[in-house]
Amino acid sequence: MIQPQTYLNVADNSGARELMCIRIIGASNRRYAHIGDIIVAVIKEAIPNMPLERSEVIRAVIVRTRKELKRENGMIIRYDDNAAVIIDQKGNPKGTRVFGAIARELRQLNFTKIVSLAPEVL
């Protein structure tokens, strides 16, 4: 469960290391975002000499949460961290690599490019 002011790790090589959520897209009064939701975030920590800089406002899709994700078959998945992948306005990832495992639910939400870049899909 991600809400405004939550810090997230960045799971790609776009140049940012840490994000802070400032808004959940498509939710006027929704409090929490889950895996597959798009958020507006600000970069809190970035790698020097990369295209993305600190305090830049970007969009990202959540790929991992510490809150459990329950599937229809009864399986429960929980990750070790909260992580997101930075995307552009069309929904394509800004980085060329994705680090760590991501949830299968992203494929159903039409983030197929992110799923194809991921080393492991759970």
From Swiss-Prot:
A GO CC annotation given for this chain: cytosolic large ribosomal subunit
Key word Transmembrane helix present: no
Single GO biological process annotation from the record: translation
InterPro entries in the cross-refs: Ribosomal_uL14, Ribosomal_uL14_bac-type, Ribosomal_uL14_CS, Ribosomal_uL14_sf
MF (Gene Ontology): large ribosomal subunit rRNA binding; structural constituent of ribosome
Family matches, as Gene3D superfamilies: Ribosomal protein L14
Subcellular location: Plastid, Chloroplast
PROSITE patterns: RIBOSOMAL_L14 (PS00049)
Disulfide bonds: none
Transmembrane domains' residue ranges: none
Record bears the keyword Ion transport: no
Classification via Pfam families: Ribosomal_L14
Protein keywords: Chloroplast, Plastid, Ribonucleoprotein, Ribosomal protein, RNA-binding, rRNA-binding
Recorded family membership: Belongs to the universal ribosomal protein uL14 family.
Assembly: Part of the 50S ribosomal subunit.
Known role: Binds to 23S rRNA.
Protein name per its UniProtKB record: Large ribosomal subunit protein uL14c
Organism: Fagopyrum esculentum subsp. ancestrale (Wild buckwheat)
